[in-house]
């Protein structure tokens, strides 16, 4: 693996170590666009590092959580570390969700990190990684990062069979075994 070089922008780099069915799949490294969407980037960063605490003061975040929804030629969705099925969400700001920061960045390439939501101003812990350009999501979902290394891992995730446990649910668990900041 090549040494990690921090972006000239000063934006943070975070990583996910992914397993598929309990077997190591590889690492995905993301640049978070703190320079454009600082609140959204910080929310994700703290869930990667475990800095965020729940109302009982316990760390909460992506480590050990699953990608609960995978749709080939579209995206891989995760971030529900509360329920593991897409029904749970929270944020670092003391509320269940926070407002859309802005829509300056577009869904114009594969490998973008974007907020999953339930409508306007409902951003929380859930996110998705695009596997193709998705311009129909522009103005509806906040882009806040991109894959800088490990798109091959995202493609392996995208090719995971689904349907046995639900329409878009992976047949084998796709898990964020470890995560953090570079």
Curated annotation (Swiss-Prot):
<keyword id="KW-0539">Nucleus</keyword>
<dbReference type="InterPro" id="IPR002130">
    <property type="entry name" value="Cyclophilin-type_PPIase_dom"/>
</dbReference>
<dbReference type="Pfam" id="PF00160">
    <property type="entry name" value="Pro_isomerase"/>
</dbReference>
<comment type="similarity">
    <text>Belongs to the cyclophilin-type PPIase family. PPIase H subfamily.</text>
</comment>
<keyword id="KW-0697">Rotamase</keyword>
<dbReference type="GO" id="GO:0003755">
    <property type="term" value="F:peptidyl-prolyl cis-trans isomerase activity"/>
</dbReference>
<keyword id="KW-0413">Isomerase</keyword>
<dbReference type="GO" id="GO:0016018">
    <property type="term" value="F:cyclosporin A binding"/>
</dbReference>
<comment type="function">
    <text>PPIases accelerate the folding of proteins. It catalyzes the cis-trans isomerization of proline imidic peptide bonds in oligopeptides.</text>
</comment>
<dbReference type="GO" id="GO:0043231">
    <property type="term" value="C:intracellular membrane-bounded organelle"/>
</dbReference>
<dbReference type="InterPro" id="IPR024936">
    <property type="entry name" value="Cyclophilin-type_PPIase"/>
</dbReference>
<dbReference type="InterPro" id="IPR020892">
    <property type="entry name" value="Cyclophilin-type_PPIase_CS"/>
</dbReference>
<protein>
    <recommendedName>
        <fullName>Peptidyl-prolyl cis-trans isomerase H</fullName>
        <ecNumber>5.2.1.8</ecNumber>
    </recommendedName>
</protein>
<feature type="domain" description="PPIase cyclophilin-type">
    <location>
        <begin position="15"/>
        <end position="181"/>
    </location>
</feature>
<dbReference type="GO" id="GO:0006457">
    <property type="term" value="P:protein folding"/>
</dbReference>
<dbReference type="GO" id="GO:0005634">
    <property type="term" value="C:nucleus"/>
</dbReference>
<dbReference type="GO" id="GO:0005737">
    <property type="term" value="C:cytoplasm"/>
</dbReference>
<dbReference type="InterPro" id="IPR029000">
    <property type="entry name" value="Cyclophilin-like_dom_sf"/>
</dbReference>
């Amino acid at each position: 693996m090549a040494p990690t070089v921090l972006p000239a922008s000063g934006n943070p780099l975070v990583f996910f170590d992914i397993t598929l069915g309990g077997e190591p799949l590889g690492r995905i490294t993301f640049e978070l666009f703190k320079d454009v969407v600082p609140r959204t980037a910080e929310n994700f960063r703290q869930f990667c590092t475990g800095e965020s605490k729940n109302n009982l003061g316990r760390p909460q975040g992506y480590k050990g959580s699953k990608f609960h929804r995978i749709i080939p030629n579209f995206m891989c969705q995760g971030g529900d570390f509360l329920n593991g099925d897409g029904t749970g969400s929270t944020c670092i700001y003391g509320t269940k969700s926070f407002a859309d920061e802005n829509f300056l960045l577009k869904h114009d390439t594969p490998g973008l990190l974007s907020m999953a939501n339930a409508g306007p101003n409902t951003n929380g812990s859930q996110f998705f990684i695009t596997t193709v350009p998705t311009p129909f999501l522009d103005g509806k979902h906040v882009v806040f990062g991109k894959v800088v290394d490990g798109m091959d891992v995202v493609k392996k995730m995208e090719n995971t069979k689904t349907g046995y446990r639900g329409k878009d649910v992976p047949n084998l668990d796709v898990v964020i075994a470890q995560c953090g900041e570079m």
